[in-house]
Amino acid sequence: MWYAKMYFSEGREIFQYDSLGTQGVPDVQKEFPFLESLLSFQELDCAEVTPILQSITDNWSRFIAEDDKEALASAMKKLGGLASIHIYFRLLYVHCRYRQSAMYIQNDRGSAEDAQILDELRQLPEQLPLYQQQIQRFFELVLDVDSAGREPQAQAAKNYFHDSPKDPDLFSFHPIPLSFEPVEPGRCSPVLYSSSIRDMIDYSLRSCVERNITVRRCKNCGRWFPQTGRVSAEYCERPVPRGEQVCREIGAFKQWTKKQSDDPIFKAYRKEYKRRFAWIKAGRITDEAFYAWSEKAREEKQKCDRDIISLAEFQQWLKESK
């Protein structure tokens, strides 16, 4: 039997998929930072994936009804493309891949399971944006540290009656297929055996509440990020394209720059540094003389930073130094 597993481990989320269902090495294993799958799902362009889903639905329907091999090949190719857009869609690919093999062994093409897959494919274009809206509302009322506070447990209890949300726009929780098993050497964890995309969303949201993990929008990129460290963190560490800085590094530099710009010692040093650097282009000073001066200026600045000399003395030194 095929499976789609998801679990959390030490700041990571792990997905394992297998279309054959052997409990050994999975076909696919992917690791992401904690909550990344849910947050990237929130950023998914549903208008982009809707026509792909509709085409897959048409092809899967033709294959089930007519044993159209070309339709099956087209559906599987597009399912593979969807899986590369977001990890949640890998579940659809693996389930269909399993049925592709199993139906010929069991001679049951058009089974209730095939009809279930078809129903899910048909409903997803409407369900995906609805899930996004419900997750957004859950963030606002339960997890967003800036609007809901630092106690997700209390906010969840406030906004739900048993397992039903008081606000109809909130995500509604249902029983999900959870196991508990070894996931790494010497470590066990709850493991979700997903049967739908909804299961994975459900597991991510309830895990945040159980762990009292809040979310916040990054001050640099504006994306949501989980506050798994300091609750005062304002910049995220979400994945970025190769070669780019993560927002937390950018934020640290911005804070340093702001601090320096407000520092009269640094401002005095920087002003004189830029003035003398311009002398190089004007031919008033050699490179060697400038760098020798800048080395001495840094030493004097450090003295001023440590209150060995006063700001006035440092400014006088800058004015008179050669």
Go through each PLM region and give its residues:
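Extracellular/mature segments of secreted proteins
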Residues: 244-245, 255-257
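Long alpha-helical, hydrophobic tracts
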Residues: 228-232, 283-284
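C-terminal accessory extensions appended to soluble enzyme cores
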Residues: 308-311
